[in-house]
């Protein structure tokens, strides 16, 4: 009775939607200690004593006792779940009345399942009443047999095929189709191996038994089929697939009954266990990707690290969803504790088959097509026919925040029921949808809802299978709230019936390109998981360890808690909004739910704001409580300073900018300005003018300032008219403003049609000057109304007619005060600069900023300084510096163009920027200044110059325009309405306050000024967002108004003018567009004949372009201001319109503009649009036809499609999904293709070339193997004959060198033992004390015997260098042993490098150039210190791949394991020989490549070597994905960027550089395991002028050129030098690309014997850059070493520019190639070869003698040898130089091979010999070989002559040669580091020690030991070397 009475009262007093559903009388409310209601206790009472009257119309009907007795079990189950008394239920009671939601349905279905009823949670939800539910339970179902029948048919079809394909017994496996969810994830993972993997980690206490953990996992994996699942692509079964039974899918799940668990245990020394786990995950990801998921994609890892143990599960999402994971870990915990499983669970075969039975694929496809097709954008261009490079799909990093919903679960459930929903899902769908539509500014959005399919069948609850699915949620924001919720309720139920669609189907329906995310947002509603045995688990899970990357911007997770609470978690792309904005978004979502609850169900969206908190709406409240009391006139501050500081400068004009002289200026003080302004005012007043418009069109002069102020003092309105405007525009402004007077000069009104009422005064006319001088100078009394117009400024109009904006005196005064306070705050020094500071007046008079510049200067007592605008801009740094500018306002583009930096403006304290977006570079430069306050300024003319501003910091968003100023209030309203949008949502900015101008002149039709709720405001038309702190973010324009070069214009005005100027009727559309070829924006007008049919192909009418563009642009220049003249006027076939709105289709026009090249637009080339985009038409080759057949089998037949060799796969209909199938099918035809490789080669022709390239690589093998074998045999025979005087029995084989070996060894032989010891590397390793030294030696002996190259030495034979391979039994490693104290061990090892290198170089023809050194501490056994091992090896024996193989072999040999036999290098040498047989083809290719290249660029003088590195911000995965989509390799991308940046840095538009190739991509048997230096180095060319207009085109050219060059990669560099007649190096810079091998499992890798500590590489190039791609860390690192630059900053800048270009690529930008190289800064050109010295017949004796040696060596005739002709022409190259230099020495010329290479002509070599005094005369006796002096007798102090001063020479008593150790240390100290080898040994002197005696002792010691009296010097005779000089 009480409940009924309360209910009646509530119904009478409350609106219907606020009447509670349930009334429960209690004697009291339970409370806790804080007197709050104890909700937990209350719920217990409710559960025990719940009573209720149903709210249905039959609530009062009598309950049928017989029916209740019959169905008591049903009612009791409902009572147990719903907490309701059975006696209150009737058969007509609805489940929605009872609050049965999705969770309750699951619980009910589960209870019915336990009683044997087969009913799903969906069927429970589908029941309207209890009787409906009973009817469902009464039906006997045949589901079990149905799914088993389906599975049986599936197995019958697929199992034989799979068995045959895998050659496996069908009894050992079973199959099941994949779900939609699994298919989609597997396809995406094949595209990117890092996607859709999950990693979970748990901390294992010390009490956990690892063996039992493993047993538990084994038990679980044995009993759950999902953990035995691998995947088989259906594409393997080409023909059979079309006949398959069951659902179509990309993969088949294979349940392998014999699958073993992937378990590993790792002991890691690393301190970062997360990094170790990441390495484990990365290894599994790569392995699975490479093997196409042919084994179960999961692994358990136990990581033992220091004092903790971690258990990690890495698993692919195709095997596991969140609910299954909880069940899985519950079972593992149970198995660990009890050795049993808790329950029998539904397995994957049954689960997937049950789902398959439910759905009809055709019906589902039709349903989703109907639901989603309305969302297709009518302007979507898709990518099916596009060949343009795509932006890389961005991987999004989420930031997550959460809050507890204000309303409880029960409240929200009741709300959902009132709005027509059976669960919370439709309610949150609508709430989230509304927020998204507002954020994206769209009426419709599509997002995804992730739901568990376990609801569909009661048997699926707890199933061990991934049963999640993503359902599309199309949402349209229209109608009232109840309608929207109801439509989503219907969609939920329908989607359950039809099932989830394939992601590929959704993409096709929506016409989304492969680069677009399918869903921009994802929503999940779930119940907080209960403890499923978690208490049994003895381990604790880590939360949120790894960064997760996704492809959707928003994710909303709604969690229903067991305590009647709802937690809302929002994850957002962290680049999309700030954390504060994200928090506001979440609060607004919660507030929206509250507003739903407070409002009537039929309320519209706009009505909800009434229930929204103001702080969540976009209102920036005024910071000033009241409006300014406008008591001061605009001239107030001028008059004030004139009285208080009359001598201060007020205005200054620069009149002279000549040459290097200081800028000439003239100025007025405040007193003079004020008096002159008063004279002007009186002159006007005497003309009886008041409140009239007065025009000013003057130059930048002192009188102009006075006239502007004087007009305002006189109570009239200033009308600025820019002198450069067309006459028609000037005339219009005079007429429209009804100007009574116009101040002009320099005849700038000649030809202007003047209105009769306008009186023109020429300020330079003598009569005006005299009249002005007679006027009174006293101040004018200010008795004018505040709202009187101060100035009238015209802006552009959309109808072609400019609009005059009336700005009042009060507006201008308020502006001065508001901005004065801002500037005083951000730049407080401004308050101290009165009389000193200067405000630069740079703005045009057509721009209202020029008024702000003047009046803000006078606000602070500064001087307004100006001058001729172009002269100031011509050298802006000079302007700032010499004029002493302290304050300025500049558009950002001007800062970029002039390159102005803070250092150029030493006096500047304030810089205002606005009108354009600022570039990041400019922002960083200026915002980082401690002296200058950088402020972003915003304000339409209608709101008095500027109404909002914000300080710009280095990390600021440059779109932020700060906060409203003064008493301004900013409102952000929904466009076209007076309703505020939510904070963070886009809307139109509306300004209120004293800055809002009076209005427009003569334009009652003009929109903008408005009255809202009785308050005057201005609608700016700008679309903005208001952030959480009320700062405003500028997004763009809502209309056609844009800003060009900082000035606002309306695009419609430009279009209207063009239309009026055209001689024929045309339609015009004007847009502001970006072009992919440049970062510049263009104003573009599209024109078409009026009435042109809007159908057919939209095309550019290029034949009329030049005429129309030129004629109409010239006409515009006569009519429009310069900034309004279009850059291009493009004729097109018709103006495209949108189907939905009939508005101009701007996207289609933008797309067309992007297809036109800059050359075409500027008239520099013919049309590319109407040219065929492919090569001349030809028939497909047989291979191409074969490829096309396979492609059609994947994408379907289309007879209408014209297929050509250059047709792309995407044009043929292939998408990312179908490419997976295509890759598998092509593999069966012999193509080695991956999905990524297909995307890199997207044309039929390119795929055919891949096949041909594979074939050609086979064909490149010796076509005449016998001839090559014979040639090798002849080489061996001749070499053996020449070695008769040597012991030859120990030689195993003789072989030619590889091209790079030849160069390296020749360099070594020709340079002898010079100090650098080129191409010898020393690698130092630590040996653990436990390592046995003798075992190390034995291991190396085994490795040397097993490796040919380590048994190879080199000899010079005639014109070649050959390899001598020593027999295994004679190959003994050469060891050196060192010992020293622990502190000096490494120094001792380092000091012997030079000696070892000399030994290698000297004996390279006798002993393999490899040495082994062992350094151990004295008494190492007792000290337990580590020993050091050094491997010294010549580069001719290894590359980075082979040296790693050698070290691996050593590790194996040390453990006494048998070594794998390394393949012989003979097949590689034969392959090279076969490639070199066709020399003419190689010569033709390389000479063509170098054709036109100027080789005269002088080598840059070497600087000190600089080394630096930089890791790119973009990850390796991101870059590889980018390259995959833009048809380029990562190597080509970095190489092209390197070449371009280097060319720009060196100012060389035509650049040759070297590229290192691995040499292991050729088809040679055993090449991968060959321990040999397979690398090759080839030259590449970059020509900025011809290789492409954009960076992408340039990189593509570089890639294509490299691809072609690889065919000739083994061409020897000496041959190239000979063909090109180049004596010096072909290139001075080198690029190499290395991709590291994936890291090994740290569990499988043992501790290595050799632990590297130090290594070195010799640098023989001015610049060497290595790009290292590391999959283990997912990074790309650039490492470089150079002698090219003076400063490290220059080298760092080169890498920074490279990263900048790469980063721009990741953003989808394609920058234009900058071809402006200016002057040659770093290089100068040498004269052409042969003109260094004039050729003449006057040969010196020395030159004649050298010529005779050349003739004797080459066989040339004496008259054929020229003085300056390079030696290369006579066959003297890097190899033959060795013999030539020997011949020279035999003839008395002491020169080395290196001397000849450095001086490669007769004239140069003669000069060198004369300079170094190395000529000893011609030796008549061949026995006199002019050998190097030997013996101490030849070492006299005379050798120092010329090297030291005479004074020093007199002090020297002896000269001696240095030991190798001394020479090495001195060289290193001089060349590398002056502190090297300098040691300081301090001693403590005991008390009483005599300092004099100490000094005497040292003096005697120095006198006794000459080493303490030795200095070191470099001499050049008889060869360059270091010597020691002993002093007296």
Swiss-Prot record:
InterPro entries assigned:
ACP-like_sf, AMP-bd_C_sf, AMP-binding_CS, AMP-dep_synth/lig_dom, ANL_N_sf, CAT-like_dom_sf, Condensatn, PKS_PP-bd
Entry keywords, A to Z: Ligase, Multifunctional enzyme, Phosphopantetheine, Phosphoprotein, Repeat
Q: What is its EC number?
A: 6.3.2.-
Adenylation: where is this region? 640-1045
Which segments carry the region annotation Condensation 3? 1855-1920
Write out the ranges of the annotated region (Condensation 2): 1297-1706
Induction behaviour: Expression is repressed by iron.
* GO BP: amino acid activation for nonribosomal peptide biosynthetic process; secondary metabolite biosynthetic process
The annotated consequence of gene deletion is: Leads to the accumulation of the intermediate N-5-trans-anhydromevalonyl-N-5-hydroxyornithine (trans-AMHO), displays sensitivity to oxidative stress and shows deficiencies in both polarized hyphal growth and sporulation. Changes its interaction with the plant Lolium perenne from mutually beneficial to antagonistic.
Stretches for region Condensation 1 = 177-460
Name of the protein in question: Nonribosomal peptide synthetase sidN
Q: What organism, scientifically named, is this protein from?
A: Epichloe festucae var. lolii
**Highest classification ranks of the organism:** Eukaryota, Fungi, Dikarya, Ascomycota, Pezizomycotina
What is the primary gene name for this protein?
sidN
């Amino acid at each position: 009775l009480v409940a009924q009475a309360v209910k009646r009262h509530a119904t009478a007093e409350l609106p219907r939607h606020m009447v509670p559903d349930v009334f429960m009388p209690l004697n009291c409310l339970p409370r806790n200690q804080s007197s709050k209601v104890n909700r937990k206790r209350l719920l217990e009472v409710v559960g025990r004593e719940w009573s209720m009257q149903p709210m249905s119309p039959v609530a009062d009907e009598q309950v049928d006792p017989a029916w209740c007795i019959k169905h008591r079990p049903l009612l009791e189950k409902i009572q147990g779940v719903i907490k309701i008394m059975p006696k209150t239920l009737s058969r007509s009671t609805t489940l929605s009345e009872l609050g049965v939601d999705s969770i309750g349905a699951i619980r009910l279905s589960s209870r019915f399942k336990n009683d044997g009823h087969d009913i799903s949670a969906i069927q429970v939800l589908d029941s309207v009443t209890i009787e409906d539910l009973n009817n469902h339970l009464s039906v006997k179902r045949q589901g079990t047999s149905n799914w088993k029948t389906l599975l049986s048919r599936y197995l019958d079809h697929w199992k034989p095929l799979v068995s045959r394909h895998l050659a496996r017994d069908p009894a050992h496996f079973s199959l099941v189709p994949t779900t939609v969810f699994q298919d989609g994830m597997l396809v995406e993972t094949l595209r990117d191996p890092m996607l859709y993997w999950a990693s979970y980690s748990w901390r294992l206490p010390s009490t956990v038994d690892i063996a039992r953990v493993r047993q538990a996992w084994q038990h679980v994996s044995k009993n759950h089929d999902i953990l035995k699942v691998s995947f088989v692509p259906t594409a393997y079964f080409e023909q059979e697939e079309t006949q398959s039974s069951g659902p179509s899918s990309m993969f088949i799940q294979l349940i392998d009954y014999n699958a073993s668990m992937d378990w590993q245990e790792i002991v890691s020394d690393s301190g970062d266990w997360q990094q170790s786990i990441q390495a484990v995950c990365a290894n599994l990801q790569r392995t699975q990707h490479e093997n196409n998921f042919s084994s179960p994609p999961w692994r358990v890892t136990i990581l033992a690290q220091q004092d903790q143990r971690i258990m990690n599960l890495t698993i692919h999402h195709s095997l596991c969803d969140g609910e299954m994971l909880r069940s899985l870990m519950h079972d593992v915990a149970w198995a660990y504790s009890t050795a049993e499983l808790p329950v029998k669970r539904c397995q994957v075969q049954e689960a997937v088959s049950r789902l398959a039975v439910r759905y009809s694929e055709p019906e589902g496809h039709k349903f989703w097509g109907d639901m989603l097709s309305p969302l297709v954008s009518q302007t979507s261009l898709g990518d099916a026919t596009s060949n343009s490079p795509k932006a890389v799909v961005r991987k999004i990093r989420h930031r997550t925040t959460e809050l507890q919903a204000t309303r409880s679960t029960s409240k929200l459930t009741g709300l959902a029921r009132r709005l027509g929903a059976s669960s919370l899902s439709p309610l949150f769908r609508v709430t989230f949808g509304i927020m998204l539509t507002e954020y994206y500014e769209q009426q419709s959005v599509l997002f995804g809802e992730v739901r568990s399919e376990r609801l569909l069948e009661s048997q699926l609850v707890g199933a061990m299978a991934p049963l999640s699915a993503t359902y599309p949620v199309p949402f349209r924001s229209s109608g009232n709230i109840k309608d929207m919720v109801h439509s989503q309720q219907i969609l939920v139920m329908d989607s359950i019936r039809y099932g989830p669609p394939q992601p590929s189907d959704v993409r096709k329906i929506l016409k989304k390109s492969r680069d677009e995310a399918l869903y921009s947002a994802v929503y999940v509603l779930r119940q907080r998981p209960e403890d499923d045995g978690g208490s049994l688990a003895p381990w604790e899970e880590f939360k949120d360890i790894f960064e997760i990357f996704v492809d959707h911007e928003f994710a909303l997770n709604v969690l229903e808690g067991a305590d009647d609470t709802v937690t809302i978690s929002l994850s957002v792309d962290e680049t999309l909004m700030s954390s504060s904005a994200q928090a506001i978004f979440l609060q607004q979502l919660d507030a929206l739910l509250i507003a739903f609850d407070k409002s009537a169900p039929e309320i519209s969206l706009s009505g909800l704001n009434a229930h929204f908190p103001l702080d969540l709406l976009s209102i920036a409240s005024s910071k000033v409580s009241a409006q300014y009391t406008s008591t001061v006139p605009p001239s107030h501050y001028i008059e004030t300073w004139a009285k208080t500081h009359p001598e201060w400068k007020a205005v200054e004009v620069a009149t002279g900018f000549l040459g290097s002289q200081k800028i000439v200026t003239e100025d007025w003080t405040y007193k003079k300005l004020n008096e002159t302004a008063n004279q002007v005012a009186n002159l006007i007043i005497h003309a009886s003018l008041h409140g009239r418009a007065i025009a000013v069109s003057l130059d930048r002069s002192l009188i102009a300032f006075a006239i502007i102020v004087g007009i305002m003092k006189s109570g009239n309105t200033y009308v600025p008219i820019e002198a450069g405007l067309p006459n028609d525009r000037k005339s219009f402004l005079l007429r429209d403003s009804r100007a009574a007077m116009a101040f002009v000069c320099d005849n700038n009104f000649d030809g202007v049609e003047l209105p009769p009422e306008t009186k023109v005064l020429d300020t330079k006319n003598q009569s005006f000057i005299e009249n002005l001088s007679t006027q009174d100078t006293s101040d004018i009394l200010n008795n004018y109304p505040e709202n009187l117009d101060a100035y009238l400024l015209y802006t552009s109009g959309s109808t072609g007619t400019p609009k005059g904006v009336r700005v009042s005196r009060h507006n201008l005064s308020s502006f001065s005060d508001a901005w004065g306070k801002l500037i005083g705050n951000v730049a407080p020094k401004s308050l101290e600069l009165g009389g000193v500071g200067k405000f630069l007046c740079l703005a045009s008079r057509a721009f209202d900023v020029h008024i702000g510049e003047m009046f803000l200067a006078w606000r602070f007592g500064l001087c307004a300084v100006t001058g001729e605008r172009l002269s100031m801009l011509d050298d802006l740094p000079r302007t700032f510096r010499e004029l002493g500018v302290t304050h300025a306002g500049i558009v950002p583009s001007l800062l970029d163009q002039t390159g102005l930096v803070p250092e150029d403006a030493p006096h500047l304290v304030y810089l205002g920027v606005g009108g354009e977006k600022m570039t990041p570079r400019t922002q960083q430069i200026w915002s980082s200044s401690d002296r200058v306050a950088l402020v972003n300024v915003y304000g339409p003319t209608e709101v008095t110059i500027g109404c909002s501003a914000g300080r710009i910091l280095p990390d600021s968003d440059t779109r932020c325009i700060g906060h409203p100023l003064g008493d301004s209030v900013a409102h952000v309203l929904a466009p076209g309405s007076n309703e505020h949008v939510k904070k963070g949502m886009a809307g139109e900015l509306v300004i209120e306050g004293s800055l809002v101008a009076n209005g427009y002149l003569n334009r009652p039709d003009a929109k903008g000024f408005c009255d809202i709720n009785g308050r005057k405001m201005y609608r700016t038309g700008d679309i903005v967002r208001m952030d959480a702190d009320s700062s405003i973010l500028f997004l763009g324009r809502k209309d056609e108004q844009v800003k060009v070069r900082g000035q606002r214009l309306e695009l419609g005005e430009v279009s209207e003018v063009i239309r009026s100027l055209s001689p024929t009727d045309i339609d015009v559309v004007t847009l502001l567009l970006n072009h992919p070829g440049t970062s510049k924006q263009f104003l573009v007008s599209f024109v078409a004949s009026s009435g042109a049919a809007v159908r057919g192909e939209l095309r550019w009418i290029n034949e009329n372009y030049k005429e129309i563009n030129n004629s109409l642009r010239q006409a515009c220049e006569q009519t429009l201001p310069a900034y309004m003249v279009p850059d291009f006027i493009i004729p097109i076939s018709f103006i495209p319109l949108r189907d939905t709105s009939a508005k101009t289709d701007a996207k289609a026009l933008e797309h067309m503009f992007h297809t036109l090249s800059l050359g075409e637009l500027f008239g520099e080339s013919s049309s590319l649009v109407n040219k065929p985009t492919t090569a001349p038409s030809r028939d497909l080759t047989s291979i191409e036809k074969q490829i096309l057949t396979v492609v059609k089998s994947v994408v379907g037949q289309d007879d209408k499609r014209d297929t050509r060799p250059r047709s792309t796969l995407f044009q043929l209909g292939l998408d990312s999904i179908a490419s997976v199938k295509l890759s598998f099918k092509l593999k069966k035809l012999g193509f080695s293709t991956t999905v990524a490789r297909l995307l890199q080669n997207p044309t039929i022709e390119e795929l055919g070339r891949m096949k041909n390239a594979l074939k050609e690589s086979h064909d490149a093998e010796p076509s005449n193997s016998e001839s090559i074998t014979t040639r090798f045999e002849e080489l061996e025979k001749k070499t053996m004959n020449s070695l008769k005087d040597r012991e030859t029995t120990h030689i195993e084989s003789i072989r030619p060198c590889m091209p790079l070996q030849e160069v390296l060894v020749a360099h070594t032989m020709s340079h002898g033992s010079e100090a650098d010891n080129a191409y010898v590397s020393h690698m130092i390793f630590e040996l653990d004390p436990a390592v046995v030294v003798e075992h190390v030696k034995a291991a190396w002996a085994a490795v040397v015997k097993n490796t040919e190259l380590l048994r190879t030495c080199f000899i010079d034979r005639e014109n070649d260098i050959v390899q001598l391979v020593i027999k295994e039994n004679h190959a003994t490693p050469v060891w050196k042993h060192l010992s020293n104290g622990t502190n000096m061990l490494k120094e001792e090892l380092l000091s012997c490098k030079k000696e070892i290198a000399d030994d290698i170089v000297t004996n390279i023809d006798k002993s393999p150039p490899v040495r082994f050194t062992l350094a151990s501490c004295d008494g190492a056994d007792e000290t337990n210190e580590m020993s050091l091992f050094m491997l010294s090896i010549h580069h001719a024996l290894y590359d980075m791949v082979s040296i790693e193989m050698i070290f691996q072999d050593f590790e194996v040999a040390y453990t006494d394991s048998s070594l794998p036999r390394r393949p012989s290098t003979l097949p590689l040498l034969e392959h090279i020989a076969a490639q070199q047989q066709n020399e003419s083809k190689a010569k033709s290719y390389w000479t063509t490549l170098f054709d036109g290249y100027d080789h005269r660029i002088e080598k840059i003088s070497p600087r000190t070597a600089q080394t630096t590195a930089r890791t790119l911000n973009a990850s390796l995965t991101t870059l590889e994905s980018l390259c995959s989509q833009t048809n380029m390799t990562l190597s080509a991308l970095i190489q092209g960027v390197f070449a371009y940046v280097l060319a720009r840095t060196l100012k060389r538009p035509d650049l040759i550089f070297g590229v290192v190739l691995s040499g292991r991509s050729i088809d040679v048997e055993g090449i991968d395991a060959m321990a040999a230096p397979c690398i090759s180095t080839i030259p590449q060319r970059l020509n900025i002028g011809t290789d492409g207009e954009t960076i992408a085109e340039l990189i593509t050219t570089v890639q294509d050129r490299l691809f072609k060059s690889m065919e000739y990669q083994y061409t020897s560099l000496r041959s190239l030098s000979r063909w090109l007649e180049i004596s010096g190096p072909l290139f001075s810079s080198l690029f190499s690309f290395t991709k590291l091998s994936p890291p090994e499992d740290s569990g499988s890798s043992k501790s290595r014997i050799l632990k590297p500590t130090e290594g070195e590489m010799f640098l023989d190039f001015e610049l060497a850059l290595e790009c290292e791609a590391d999959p283990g860390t997912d990074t790309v690192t650039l490492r470089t070493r150079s002698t090219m630059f003076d400063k490290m900053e220059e080298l760092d800048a080169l890498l920074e520019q490279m990263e900048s270009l790469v980063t721009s690529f990741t953003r989808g930008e394609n920058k234009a190639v900058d071809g402006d190289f200016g002057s040659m800064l770093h290089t100068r050109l040498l004269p052409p070869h042969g003109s260094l010295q004039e050729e003449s017949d006057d040969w010196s004796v020395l030159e004649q003698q050298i010529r005779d040696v050349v003739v004797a060596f080459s066989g040339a005739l004496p008259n054929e040898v020229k003085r300056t002709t390079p030696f290369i022409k006579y066959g003297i190259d890097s190899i033959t130089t060795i013999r030539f230099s020997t011949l020279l020495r035999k003839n008395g010329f002491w020169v080395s091979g290196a001397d000849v290479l450095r001086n490669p002509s007769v004239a140069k070599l003669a000069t060198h010999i004369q300079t170094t005094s190395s000529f000893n005369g011609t030796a008549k006796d061949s026995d006199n070989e002019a050998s190097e002096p030997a013996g101490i007798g030849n070492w006299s102090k005379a050798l120092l002559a010329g090297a030291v001063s005479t004074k020093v020479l007199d002090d020297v008593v002896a000269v001696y040669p240095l030991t190798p150790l001394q020479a090495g240390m001195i060289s290193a100290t001089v060349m590398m580091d002056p502190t090297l080898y300098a040691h300081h040994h301090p001693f403590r002197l005991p008390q009483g020690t005599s300092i004099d005696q100490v000094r005497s002792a040292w003096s005697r010691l120095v006198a006794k030991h000459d080493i303490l009296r030795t200095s070191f010097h470099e001499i050049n005779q008889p060869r360059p070397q270091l010597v020691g000089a002993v002093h007296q």
